[in-house]
Amino acid sequence: MQLKRVAEAKLPTPWGDFLMVGFEELATGHDHVALVYGDISGHTPVLARVHSECLTGDALFSLRCDCGFQLEAALTQIAEEGRGILLYHRQEGRNIGLLNKIRAYALQDQGYDTVEANHQLGFAADERDFTLCADMFKLLGVNEVRLLTNNPKKVEILTEAGINIIERVPLIVGRNPNNEHYLDTKAEKMGHLLNK
């Protein structure tokens, strides 16, 4: 186990009341959060979203990505379902950090795509570690999920880490003229499933 569960509190939102659960990485002290809606116990697979932190999309309403749209759509679907989990994975910019993400944006403004920009900065296309999320699910007592994602690599890594993904639920929202190239690159170079 790479994490420990350290704190929890009620979090009222426009979608209803969630239980916010805080986790701390044992090796680094970095924190991550789960938002739990309704009763997630039992044997029925839970609707879940692993959402990687995106300050620009989630809090600053950037149209360069689909992250903020996905966050809102996931919370809406979880609330409509009556139970579910959103893991807020604190690995900004596919885990290159906020300042490097801004540098990557500047490279994209010069014509590089999102993958090329990461490579120009010395990073892989995706630096995230989703095994942390498998540990978060396990600490919440959940082993079977219906995962809201367009990323087959996320499904693969969580499955290898012991989470039974019963169904991949597409989450295709937020395409606009500002992020079309970004989304097309994610589909073409990173294998994201954005046409279903």
UniProtKB/Swiss-Prot annotation:
Recorded metabolic or biological pathway in which this protein acts: Cofactor biosynthesis; riboflavin biosynthesis; 5-amino-6-(D-ribitylamino)uracil from GTP: step 1/4
Role of this protein: Catalyzes the conversion of GTP to 2,5-diamino-6-ribosylamino-4(3H)-pyrimidinone 5'-phosphate (DARP), formate and pyrophosphate.
Active site feature: D126, R128
Catalytic activity: GTP + 4 H2O = 2,5-diamino-6-hydroxy-4-(5-phosphoribosylamino)-pyrimidine + formate + 2 phosphate + 3 H(+)
GO CC entries: cytosol
Gene Ontology BP annotations: riboflavin biosynthetic process
Organism the protein comes from: Escherichia coli O45:K1 (strain S88 / ExPEC)
HAMAP family in alphabetical order: RibA
UniProt-listed SUPFAM superfamilies: RibA-like (SSF142695)
Gene3D superfamilies linked to this entry: GTP cyclohydrolase II (3.40.50.10990)
Cofactor(s) listed in the protein's UniProt record: Zn(2+)
EC number: 3.5.4.25
Assembly: Homodimer.
Family to which this protein belongs: Belongs to the GTP cyclohydrolase II family.
Name used for this protein in its record: GTP cyclohydrolase-2
GO molecular function: GTP binding; GTP cyclohydrolase II activity; zinc ion binding
CDD domains associated with the record: GTP_cyclohydro2
Key words, A-Z: GTP-binding, Hydrolase, Metal-binding, Nucleotide-binding, Riboflavin biosynthesis, Zinc
EC category name: hydrolase
InterPro entries: GTP_cyclohydro_II (IPR032677), RibA (IPR000926), RibA-like_sf (IPR036144)
UniProt remark on cofactor binding: Binds 1 zinc ion per subunit.
Keyword GTP-binding found: yes
